[in-house]
């Protein structure tokens, strides 16, 4: 790799690390190309990304970023998964690791907080931002639905009583 290409790769990675809220580091040795493509697709669908780069260049790119604490994890064949949603990358990484034993999660970072393997798994078990929004909307809408049901219930009961009385009058 030429010096200019290395500089460009470092700048690209640094830009990615500046905008990410979570970074997960894992070993991928032994994965097939098809498995790596599947991982990339799953990450992309979740709104995350996967990067494989030289560890030395990645360490240089990490300098001055919130996720700089993952530097010591970059040893051997590593892949870095990042996302702006704090739950997206960990969730996909943990699910992928369950299906592929050759994909080994080493740890990660959420902002300036360093995560070990258990921390990544705990983060993956949390609901995503979209799921939390859906729950919040459901909680806000529930009282309005209840009020509508309570206000229409007496009118419906009255209508049924009148209908029953009218049916009784016609039958007699």
UniProtKB/Swiss-Prot annotation:
GO molecular function: any one? large ribosomal subunit rRNA binding
Please indicate if the UniProt record lists Metal-binding as a keyword: no
Entry keywords, A to Z: Ribonucleoprotein, Ribosomal protein, RNA-binding, rRNA-binding
Name the Pfam families on file: Ribosomal_L10 (PF00466)
Please tell me whether the keyword Ribonucleoprotein is annotated for this protein. yes
Q: In the UniProt record, which is one GO cellular component term?
A: large ribosomal subunit
Gene Ontology process terms (BP)? translation
* Recorded superkingdom: Bacteria
Name the protein family: Belongs to the universal ribosomal protein uL10 family.
Describe its partners and assembly state: Part of the ribosomal stalk of the 50S ribosomal subunit. The N-terminus interacts with L11 and the large rRNA to form the base of the stalk. The C-terminus forms an elongated spine to which L12 dimers bind in a sequential fashion forming a multimeric L10(L12)X complex.
Role: Forms part of the ribosomal stalk, playing a central role in the interaction of the ribosome with GTP-bound translation factors.
Q: Know the name of this protein?
A: Large ribosomal subunit protein uL10
Source organism (scientific name):
Rhodopseudomonas palustris (strain TIE-1)
